[in-house]
Regions:
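Structural motif corresponding to the intra-repeat A-B loop/turn of tetratricopeptide repeats
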Residues: 15, 26, 60-63, 105
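Canonical positions in the second alpha-helix
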Residues: 38-39, 76, 118
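Residue-level recognition of tetratricopeptide repeat
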Residues: 46, 91, 124-125
Length: 136
């Protein structure tokens, strides 16, 4: 069942974030990524598989230097943008990652686009405001 798979994937993700299991983090992340990939394939019109893959790969690349989470945040965002009732916090997380990714890559124009999207969703968002203030 997809729901059970999804919950098992989240269990692995949260185990990977627990400091008591840091030695097993790569194993938990690999398992979670595999499960969320299956969820994304089985339910392609739902953002959750890609969104959680993004979170997993963000843990694998904490400095965002490799952009491992980028394709999954983009995929989740493309699904979410088709849904008028999309959860704002999820939209903000996707756009924040992508804004930061492009900032790290020194593509400031692209970075600004994502930070501005956040301000359209949440005009009081301090992170987006600070990020835009830091881009020349």
């Amino acid at each position: 069942c997809i729901r059970d798979s999804f919950l098992y994937g989240r269990l692995n993700y949260y185990a990977a974030t627990d400091s008591a299991y840091q030695d097993k983090q790569p194993t938990y992340l690999a398992e979670a990524d595999t499960i969320f990939a299956q969820v994304a394939v089985k339910v392609p019109d739902n953002y959750l598989g890609n969104f959680w893959r993004a979170r997993v790969n963000s843990l694998r690349d904490p400095e965002t230097t490799q952009g491992l989470a980028k394709p999954y945040y983009e995929a989740a965002l493309s699904i979410l943008e088709q849904k008028p009732d999309a959860t704002k916090s999820v939209l903000v997380e996707c756009n924040s990652y992508l804004g930061y990714y492009y900032f790290v890559k020194e593509d400031y124009n692209q970075s600004k686009q994502y930070w501005n999207k956040i301000l359209e969703i949440d005009p009081e968002n301090e992170t987006a405001t600070k990020a835009l203030g830091g881009i020349k």
